Each structure stands twice: as structure tokens, then as C-alpha cells.
């Protein structure tokens, strides 16, 4: 019965087809909301007719009666196609969920799937996984599956997802097909995806001089079509999980200027001084491993603007990406504390060597390898393990509970 239940929830136990690009994510409070979204169009099932939206049935796992949730749909960006849009993005949004509760849902007559709302208190250990720089490769699929096999509450990916560069819609769709296949955890639960932005989400990669937020959003059409519900404003995002975890999702100069976010970072770190586990995440590293400290202006700016603010705060650690290898450094501490920086993004891409002399002096761990960070939070402390492609442990750091 246990095996049958797993097959059913992973889409192998009954007729019908789960959308090939099914993504669960959050646009609001992770403890009480959930968003499911998927694409319809060529190769992905018929686009919904006007007035005939897809219907989702859902219920708590233990409940006897199913409820009905109506979906909404919008055109999905299709930059290479002149004329009719080929794909449509369909969404189902749940509100007022119970924290730390499992729910079943069924899209049309497709197999039943399961999700879990986030707990609002840290009464038992919580795991999430983290990485960046993925691409659409066999190694990318392997690394995402490895992350999901850890049975995490969610996966956070800090930019450079599909390498679609804001224009290659076919590549973008292939990436989400790959994620959808990987996203079923060992117990049949679909793992939510928390996305950060990198240069390969944006046409041109970085903020254009004089461009407005609205103009830059248009240069990252897929990212904002999928995740604009979370990134609504011209500022970073703070994703809060009850009273125990906060993720500060920054933009390292891709749509938002770096300097425009410094005051936000300072204020939001101050607001979360009582939160035991606070992580900041962005794409371009403050402490590169393949590039040098002055290789590009964004590296210099995030190090000059944000590192002193973080060193003067109670932040637990920082996740960086962009340089395609595993490197952990401790910041120099001139702003107050030495902060661990976990980088630098290799969740499927071809790993690069460590050749930054400035960062090597601060380096605590390095591997020219793909990796995924597995973060376990407990009442008495936290552990971050970095796993290589075969699940081998490449690095491990133990954190005592924040005493503040």
C-alpha cells in the first residue's frame, strides 16, 4: 500500500497526465499560501478556452470531502514568435491554508499530487536545499533530483536557471519540464521552487543605464511572468517562515541597481534581529572563485555595499553563485562579524577551477564540482552540508543557535 501510494502521488498510478511544467511556488506567506502554475500550448496540452478555465480539486490529506479551486490564465511571453502567442500560463492560488499541513490536489483528471504548507514554528527540524547556475543538462536534472531526495521544505535557486537570457522560450520550457520531473520528493510531495534572478534571466544580463524598473522587467520576461507575484516591487524580497527563518532575496544588478537595495537590506536585517535563522541570497558573488575581485563592477559593488551591512548584522550566512564551483569563504569582518559565504553556484553546469587569489586567502572550503547545499534548521542549531553529484559530502558547517 505504501508503494502504491507513492506511485499514485508521483503520477504513475492512474490515467491522465500531470502538466509537464508543473511548478509550486510562493507569492505570499509560505505558512498559509501556495501557488501552482503550469504552461499549456504546443507539446504541453491544449490551452484553456476562454470561459472554460481548468479546475483543481483539493483537500487536506485527512479530510473526506474535496473542494474546488478555479484557475486563471495569462499569455506566456514568446519573444521569438511574431503574431499569436503559443503558450499560456495557468495558475491556481491557495489562501488561508493551515501551517505545516499536507494537502492533496488534482488538476482536471490528472493523477493526484501532494504539497505541504510551511510550519510557522520550529518544533521539529526543517530542511531546505539551495544552489544556483543550473542549465538544461543531464547533470542539471541529476543535481535537482539529488536536492529533492533530501525531502526539503523547498528548493531555493539563486539565478541562472535555464540560461534562456530572456528570449529563448523553448529553452525556458525545457528547464521547467526538467524541474517538474525532479520535483517529486520521496514521499510523493511536490517541492516548491523559490527563484532568484541572475544575469541569464535578463536580456543583456544587467541593469541598463537609465532604464526604469518596468523597462528592466520587460528584459526578463520569463522570470517575471513566473515569479512576478513574489517580486512585485522595485526592491528585494523578504520571505519569512513563521518566527524562525527569513530569506532575503537580493538582485545583484540585473533588474535593480545594487546601491538602491542597500538601505532595504539594512532595514530588513534590523527588523529580523530576533529571527534565529536569516540568510541572504543573490547571484553575482562578493567573493568570486573563478573571476577576480575586480573582474566586473557588480562583484565590487556587492562587496562594498552589502558586505559591511551584513557584517554588522545577525545574519546567519550568505548564498552566492555565478562562478560555477563550490567555495566557502569567511568575510574579512571589518564591518563587525566574519560572515560565511557559501558559493559559487554549480547545480548542473560544468564546474570551473578556483583561480581568484584574493578569495583563496579567505577560503575555508573548495571543490571543482557541482553541489547542492542542504540546510537543516533545529531549535538548538543548524547544519549546512554541501553534497556533490553522487551525494558525497564536500563540506559541512555547524551553526549554534543565534543567541540574540
Question: What is the predicted function of each stretch?
Answer:
Residues 1-11:
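Bacterial N-terminal signal peptides
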Residues 14-130, 149, 368, 374-404:
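Acidic, histidine-bearing metal-coordination/catalytic regions of metal-dependent phosphoesterases
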Residues 49, 65-89, 125-140, 165-166, ...:
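Acidic/histidine-rich helix-loop elements
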Residues 88-93, 99-116, 171-277, 293-297, ...:
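Extended active-site neighborhood of metal-dependent phosphoesterases/phosphodiesterases
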Residues 110-165, 169:
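An acidic-aromatic substrate-binding cleft motif
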Residues 119-135, 261-300, 394:
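Mobile, glycine- and charge-enriched loop segments
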Residues 128-130, 155-157, 195-196, 280, ...:
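Residue-level marker for buried hydrophobic side chains located in beta-strands
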Residues 133, 159-160, 198-199, 250, ...:
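Active-site glycine-centered loops adjacent to acidic/histidine catalytic or metal-binding residues
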